Amino acid sequence: MNNTDTLEKIIRHQKNKDPAYPFQEHLLMQLCIRANKRMQDNISEFLGAYGINHSVYMVLTTLFTAESHCLSPSEISQKLQFTRTNITRITDFLEKTGYVKRTDSREDRRAKKISLTSEGMFFIQRLTLAQSMYLKEIWGYLTHDEQELFEVINKKLLAHLDDVSS
């Protein structure tokens, strides 16, 4: 018996005790939670093989997509909704790896800018290529139609969850 069989058995037991129990809804919620957890674990493992975590990856991609590959810590913090302390910690790590460098701002001598180095550019390009193959491996299991349906359902559910939680 696999994990989903056990899960269904437990939820079905609740349904048998109370015929009005929302079996399908509970099962879908549990499957979403488990799929999300597994996906997060897989992504963490994938990024870990490159010596980084998801927060570091987000900072690198934010710099990579920025004009001149350069932003202030407050701009990064605002874009990613990370604390300034977290941005400082991540920048310290990335500076030690040689992927970014801090420079003085041209506009304000007191301010700093964080720039992606050539090593950082090479790293994020290499990582993006590997990630592309990894994502195709994960999502390639579903047909194109299934992927599109999954996207539509998730967007619809996310919009509804925003309404419900408001």
UniProtKB/Swiss-Prot annotation:
Key word Metal-binding present: no
Alphabetized GO MF terms: DNA binding; DNA-binding transcription factor activity
Keyword tags: Cytoplasm, DNA-binding, Transcription, Transcription regulation
Xref: InterPro entries: HTH_MarR-typ, Tscrpt_reg_MarR-type_CS, WH-like_DNA-bd_sf, WH_DNA-bd_sf
Domain HTH marR-type: 25-159
Pfam hit, one: MarR
Entry keyword Transcription: yes
Cleavable signal peptide: none
Subcellular localization, as worded in the UniProt entry: Cytoplasm
Gene3D superfamilies xrefs: Winged helix-like DNA-binding domain superfamily/Winged helix DNA-binding domain (1.10.10.10)
Chief place of localization: cytoplasm
Superkingdom, natural source: Bacteria
A GO CC annotation given for this chain: cytoplasm
PANTHER family with a match to the protein in the record: TRANSCRIPTIONAL REGULATOR, MARR (PTHR42756), TRANSCRIPTIONAL REPRESSOR OF EMRAB OPERON (PTHR42756:SF1)
Name used for this protein in its record: HTH-type transcriptional regulator PrsX
Gene encoding the protein: prsX
